[in-house]
Amino acid sequence: MRRLVIAGNWKMYKNNSEAVATLTELKNLTKDVNNVDIVIGAPFTCLSDAVKAVAGSNVKIAAENIYPKIEGAYTGEISPKMLKDIGVEYVILGHSERREYFKESDEFINQKVKAVLEIGMKPILCIGEKLEEREGGKTLEVLATQIKGGLADLSKEEAVKVIVAYEPVWAIGTGKTATPEMAQETHKEVRNVLAEMFGKEVADKIIIQYGGSMKPENAKDLLSQEDIDGGLVGGASLKADSFFEIIKAGN
């Protein structure tokens, strides 16, 4: 039985005091949540205080990026070792915004996945197709390429530690969302690709989140699908009360 993981991705929003205030509110709201793992991805400047703000709760903290080296002369970069040292447990990798704006390749994302696993943290690997790719019938081709590239050369033992987040790019921040049935169909195809790579037993253990404009209104229907194991939530995670409504839908 896969455990639901509902994660928020704050992107480049919230200063430190705003982050601490929101996390303190979320910690209080979720104190009785037992059936869902809760994660918040926060900006680098907030991470240390974010970890302290949720200490002793079932809310965990993620970084939104890393550089795939443990240390070295890489001016301006942050290593997974630095993040683990302050108590960060997850890292969001391969988000469509990183792929588009910073031209991150599947090969580079794969290096990041390996670096995060090597240090004992949990990667959340984002995959997703653009609108023209979906309309052109290339959804599965695009996702398979991203999965096979992002998870290349991983052992079965490593693969089960990775969370895959399917985020249709056409649904991020647009208000559009896949129907629960569309999302389930794609998640099943993603799991089939994982089974090709690592075998069915491993694929059945890998958590696959949905991340295309999940909000309180559609969360329950999405999370009730067989192959949807949580959410990677953008805008609706910025307020503790709306994020809590999504968590309740999973709990």
Which residues make up each language-model segment?
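Active-site loop-to-helix "anion-binding N-cap" substructures in soluble metabolic enzymes
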Residues: M1-N251
